[in-house]
Amino acid sequence: MDGWRSRFKRLHRTLSVGEEQCTPAIKLNSPDATLQTEACAPEDEGGLPPVQLCGYLSSTRDRLLTAELCAELRPLMPSRIQLYTKWCLLYSLEQHGASLHSLYEHVRPEEPAKARVGYLLIMRDRRGGLFGAYANEPFRPTESRRYSGNGECFLWSADLHPMLRLRAYPYTGLNEFCIYCTSGFLSMGAGSGHYGLWCDEGLVHGVSERSPTFGNDALSREGPRFHIVALEVWRVG
């Protein structure tokens, strides 16, 4: 755990946007013209190869994940997850419709995973705020009061202008309320009547307040209550 926590010593990292120009390699690999885009992010300090982003349609206008954001989020993930170079878009509000049920259906693994993978949640609010969460397992509804997830989970928010600045909120160990999903909402982080990140079944309204689980500030620029403009879930690995 100490080794994992050391990755969060630098929670404010900066990256100049647009310093390196590149032409994505595009492969049409399905009847619905799904694109595979090879992100031209430079190798990070650990010498990891660049990430390949797969799943955006050619018609998709709202694309939340960029090579620059990948480069900032990747070092915060578990070491074994950092080694993966293929990140796949499982759910997009624009591509699949605004429905939590649809999100669960698209995120659900088709077969048992042969190796552990990670899941990245990204949201954007009406003021352009970009934020989300990393989860060690897929989001799936439960009717019990049992939380899931472990200490690998974290919340994050990002400022895009004038340069990309990422702020991450790692697991504090104060409680085990990492992930809790039902048919009516999805949430990460909780305690004392507050959710670190919460969204409703229509993926229209969200809540982000300080939670003991992650010790986070409100992630949205709109404040504790926000409107969801765009949302994506990615599988890392």
Swiss-Prot record:
Keyword Coiled coil: no
Top-level taxon of origin: Eukaryota
Bridged cysteine pairs (disulfide): none
A biological process term (GO) from this entry: response to oxidative stress
Pfam families: TLD
A single Gene Ontology CC term: nucleus
Subcellular localization, as worded in the UniProt entry: Mitochondrion
Residue span, TLDc domain: 63-237
Keywords in alphabetical order: Mitochondrion
Keyword Membrane on entry: no
Function: May be involved in protection from oxidative damage.
PANTHER family (UniProt xref): MUSTARD, ISOFORM V, NUCLEOLAR PROTEIN 7/ESTROGEN RECEPTOR COACTIVATOR-RELATED
Assigned protein family: Belongs to the OXR1 family.
Protein name from the UniProt record: Oxidation resistance protein 1
Gene: OXR1
